[in-house]
Amino acid sequence: MRPLRSIFLLVAASCMAVAQEAPVPGLAVLPGAVNGAFIERNGKLLAVYGDPSGNRPGAGMVLITHARRDVVWAARSLLAKGAKAVVPEKEADLLVRPEKFWGEFREKRFHDYAQRSTKVPIEAIRPDRTVKEGDTLEWEGLSIRVLETPGYTRGAVTYLADLGGKKVAFTGDLIRDDGKLQDLFSLQDAIPSARIGGYHGWAGRLGDLVTSLGKVAAERPDVIVPARGPVLRDPRAAIDRLLARIRSAYSNYLSVDALRWYFKDGHILVKAQRVLGPDARVDWMPMAETLPLPDWIVPISNSRLLLAADRSGLLVDCGGAKIVEELKKMRAGGKLASIGEVFITHYHDDHTDALPLLAKEFGSGVTACGSLVDVLERPGDYRLPCLTKNPVAVAGKRRDGESWRWKEFKLTIHDFPGQTLHHNALLVERDGGVAAFFAGDSLTPSGIDDYCLQNRNFLGEGRGFLRCLDIVEKLPAGCLLLNQHVGPAFRFTPEQVARMRETIRKRTLLLADLFPFDAPDYGLDEGWAALHPYSVAVAPGESARLALRITNHSPRERTFRAAPRPPEGLTAVPAGPVRIAARADGEIGITVGAPPGAAPGVRVLAAGVAWEDGELREWVEALVEVRE
């Protein structure tokens, strides 16, 4: 076998990559979209993560820290050349049987409240061995210990080895750079100890990640080789910085957390203490004033009925059959004459599932504006939380800010990207009476509703909740705020609105320190890159078009490229690079083809996205059905 140094020179020449200086004797790290770490011993090679160049002649073994396809792709070339794979026991099923996950996910992506990241592998990896906490691998006289370090994923591990008199930790995506995280959306999860489900668990595995960082710190490694980013030569300082950044950002988040209204202080303190420590206290914003609903607003489950003087009705949202049944009872009892229109605040299934039934019973037309319209009409084209399977035609396609008269009311619709990016709000001003603002699920008396990161909550002036607060601040004096999951109406004081605004602005700065990107939204918004439509069908001998949709969150124009990786039996050809202005959207077309004779069935197509100074391999996916 060639000496390690000469091999790396060969790799560098062939792929224009340069290996970092070896952090310790016998260890070399090849940087890339994922790092490749190589240990040489007795003329043999062991790899951690894999080979980002794809040009290595081989290795005897590959250690995999976690089951993310945007990481494990780097191991594929070595495994094809005969390397044996070692994988975490708790994530082995995702690696060994990814087809099981994807087979179920075709339906589970609808009504999805679990919010597991979809960066699940697509191609199976057959491990030679699985490992768990306390295991030791023996390789060429080298003992490699295993720590379970969940956080970035549910079952990740860290590998520890003494090399050249130095303790080296291979920590996967647990930490990177000088104490940063790759993102927070990958940590969305349930928090069982606080009785909080996956949908409500904003970065729910932060508590696990904090514990895992403590375990790694207790080992006192001299060097950390992460899956991404530079080698860490002062691990203790980097871990301390990351812990401080996490706790500052989490404290900020909790201080205006809408979930406090629903779950009360005790549950929120449980999740706070997992991250902030056992003595944690939260500097909560005071609760907003609550007020009774006026008699012309009728609560029906999580819908609200506006009742005009002539007994005509306008409904806000319709998520369940029981709502329609109650409306039928009101009609039969003479309290309700008709419902000609239903306004939709957002696409979540608990607000939209029964719209077809409502239309059948009352002939009600749907009203919405902005990006919400397409999600309502084509929910299956999206990968978003809480999707309904029931598309509806939007008869009343309004413009943001448009006003119109309905009976004795003036109505004004707003694009209101709060709880979700695809969200509307409705200002209702009754002639001679109080005004009411239907904010959907975006606000509660305790603050802002951004607890599901997959909903796409943007930071920055004029975006996300800052845009929403701008609208709230301009509402008529005394205007009531309504969230249909909250019984009473409520009002924020000017001081509360100012506090929420300043909290979000501070959060922007805190997260800029936490993430490795030039805009913190890349670490919050999993949907900044997505294949659209999420599910397509193609016949053998034909093709279909996908688009890699990209939101350039950066403060400057960027050029993006698509790198599709079609599954066996399909082709995928991307269009050329696209230049997208700062904080704007763009897309790259991808033509997906099925050759004549292609076997029927559903396949998963992944695509990477790259820009001037970054790359994420196999980052997005779409489901492609080959029809019979």
What function would you assign to each model-found segment?
Residues L509-A539:
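Low-complexity, acidic Ser/Thr/Pro/Gly-rich terminal tails and inter-domain linkers that flank the onset
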Residues I550-S554, A594:
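Asparagine-centered strand-capping/turn motif at beta-strand->loop junctions
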Residues V578-G586:
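Short proline/glycine- and polar residue-rich coil/turn motifs
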Residues L45, T136, S143-R236, R241, ...:
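Metallo-beta-lactamase
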Residues G593-A599:
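Short, surface-exposed loop/turn segments at beta-strand-coil junctions that are enriched for proline
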